[in-house]
Amino acid sequence: WKMAPEGLTVHTSRMPFFADRFDSPFDEMESHLPRVIDEVNSAQPDIIAYGCTASSAKGNPIDYEKQLTQNTGKPTVTAAAALVEALKTFSAKKIVMITPYPQSTNDKERVFFQGNGVEVIEDESIIIDDAQLKFKNMNKIPTDLLIDRSVSLGQAENVDAVILSCCDMPTLDAIPIIEDAIGKPVTSSTQALFWRAIRTAGILDPIEGVGSLLIRT
């Protein structure tokens, strides 16, 4: 909502995620897609955004978007594809990736990005609570800590951009501060997903205050 231009409404539904109950929680979460699709389609949206990076970071992200679009009947974009497309917009080939994930998830996302032409120079998991190892409390990462780690790693000369991966991690206040500090583009799952959704919907309004990506058309 913070990024929404005047006249745009945002409607949500949620897929339940029970990492402490299932060995493959992302697969179990995706099993709820038919219900969630019905719920969001009841609002007659122009476009649907799939807000989970880890579960959408697979293979060719555009192919996965096409698959979801067939299932939903509406143009559908994903967080993982949005990050890849945002990096293309920045002409960024070498990145630092900051996440609140367990290292095993970072490793999977590193493979995903490298498979899509992006070299992950360094990744870091910010873990402040053991519950994060079960994908809980991702939204508890302090903004000051996120800024500090992003600036520390992102200022390296061989880094083109910084990504903050995880739709549940608060990032919008941090992005402009990090960009100002390192003089390089910064994007996050939430920011990139919103950018891809509104641009796909034909909304070209520049949006100030949440990073350089949303100023671009």
Please place each PLM-identified region on the residue numbering:
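Glycine/small-residue-rich loop that forms an oxyanion/phosphate-binding "nest" at active or ligand-binding sites
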Residues: 36-81
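Conserved beta-alpha
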Residues: 71-132, 215
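Short, acidic/small-residue loops that bind anionic groups at enzyme active sites
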Residues: 65-87, 178-197
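Short, flexible loop segments at boundaries between secondary-structure elements
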Residues: 128-135, 182-206
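N-terminal glycine-rich anion-binding loop in soluble enzyme alpha/beta folds
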Residues: 1-35, 103-142
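Periplasmic-binding protein-like
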Residues: 46-52, 96-97, 159-166
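Short, well-structured alpha-helical segments in soluble
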Residues: 30-44, 145-159
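Active-site/ligand-binding-proximal alpha/beta "capping" segment
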Residues: 147-163, 168-185
